[in-house]
Each structure stands twice: as structure tokens, then as C-alpha cells.
Amino acid sequence: FMDFGMSFTQEGQFFSQFLGARTSNSLNDMFELGILPKIKGLYRRDYAKHMDFDGTEDTEIDAVLLTHAHVDHCAYLPYLREDIPIYCSEESKLILQNFDETSSSQYLTAKQRFQIYENKKGTMSKATGDKVAIPRRVEIFESGKEFSIDSINVEPLPVDHSIPGVHAFILHTSDSTIG
């Protein structure tokens, strides 16, 4: 899977700067509007179990290769299932970390929603903060140094772009090379 970003044109048909998807139902909104594909095993379990998925299905997605941290390439990573590894450059990871620290985004740590627990008073409370934080698996690659994801060898090549840490990938399989 390569990148998981938003299409400005597609989102612009339905949303604006001050009108976005509903916070508590955003994944369903994205499905209904045709913005995100409905693929079982791709999305966060805490979201998926409130959709047509049960959230426990196996995933066929081995990883996400992130070319860089512009939103048209990474905006939908917060919807990604937390156990699917994200492969990126150190620079891209730092940019994603900055997004997490300066906004309500959840690029590197998924904070589970819809989690309830019995508090000390014996009543039900909504779990928040570190109680519901699940760190995502982020794998840092070195520029120009080949690495493997299952049977695919990935060759990350640096690309000049408007932010640091941008890479193109050449994928080497037993049958062919893509890139």
C-alpha cells in the first residue's frame, strides 16, 4: 500500500475549511461519500466495529509506504489500523509527530474512541488520553538502503520536493521491478 492521503478535489466537493466530516462518525461519512474505499482489515478496530465491519477481521495489508508527509499523501493515516506498519523516512516521522503534538491528529499514536470503563465511583466513564493511546508501528528506512516487506524488496530513493525526507520507491519482486 503506498501513501494514504486525501484528494483535495474530492474532499472539496463535500467539505470546506470550517465544515468537515463528523468527528464521531467520520469513517462512515468517508465511505458514504466515496472518499475512502471500504476495505475490511484496513481501518482502526475501534472505528471498524461501529461500521459494517466487526473490527476483528484479519488484514491483508502488510504495510504502508509513505513517500512524504504532505496531507495529500498522509491525511488518512489516522484511520489506518494501528497494527499495520508505516514505513517512512526519519524526517517524515518527525513531521507526523509534529502534527500529533500541535493538533488533534493521531498519526503516530491512535487514541481509541468509544472506550468506556467503570470508574472509582462505580459509574461508567469515557476513557481518554494515555489510557486509550496505542502507538503505531513506524519503521524508519534509510535513504538509498534497500529493505524488505515480506517478499518485496523496497529501494527508497531521495526526491527533491518542498519538504525534507521525500522518497520515491522502486519495488523489486521475484517477477518484476516496479518504479
Regions found by a protein language model. Name each.
Residues Y79-R81:
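Short, conserved loop/helix-junction motifs that constitute active-site signature segments
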Residues P135-R137:
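Eukaryote-biased recognition of long, low-complexity, charge-rich segments
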